[in-house]
């Protein structure tokens, strides 16, 4: 299946790259992963609307094969940007014909929480556990909750699209 092929490729890439980050242009990602990511990005745009700097970094996110077990990282060269792990997104966004809404919830939660964590690093310029980072993450958490209420109808369209994609059937 496409999933096992991409998963094997991902594992090979992780071994090869070690700690280096190999980004993959979004248009080179396989379907339906690419269209699920497009929907996730739309949701992320709504939940970070009006947050100084954060929304810009959300719009500039890249996708990469990161070191195994790492789901997101902040890069500073050549420019500051957030990289999210293709493998982690695929693990979180699995087909589930029986419980597609639960699958979609897990997919969205994993994507948004990892993204907001990394964006908090970029915005604060601070490491895990520092007061600046905690303040930045707390601010993003507050915005994401209130924006979810504010933009509920808009966000729901993208959630429904993800649900239908995760309900299958998987492409061959």
Task: Explain the meaning of each model-derived region.
Residues 113-125:
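Active-site recognition of the HExxH zinc-binding catalytic motif
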Residues 40-52, 119-120, 137-145:
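Hydrophobic, Leu/Ile/Phe/Ala-enriched alpha-helical segments that form helix-helix packing faces
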Residues 108-112:
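Alpha-helical scaffolds flanking conserved acidic
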Residues 70, 126-171:
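Post-HExxH zinc-binding segment in Zn-dependent metallohydrolases
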Residues 1-65:
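A metal-dependent hydrolase signature that marks the N-terminal structural subdomain at the beginning
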Residues 54-93:
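Catalytic zinc-binding patch centered on the HExxH motif and its immediate surroundings
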Residues 1-12, 101-107, 122-123:
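Charged regulatory segments coupled to nucleotide-binding catalytic modules in large multidomain enzymes
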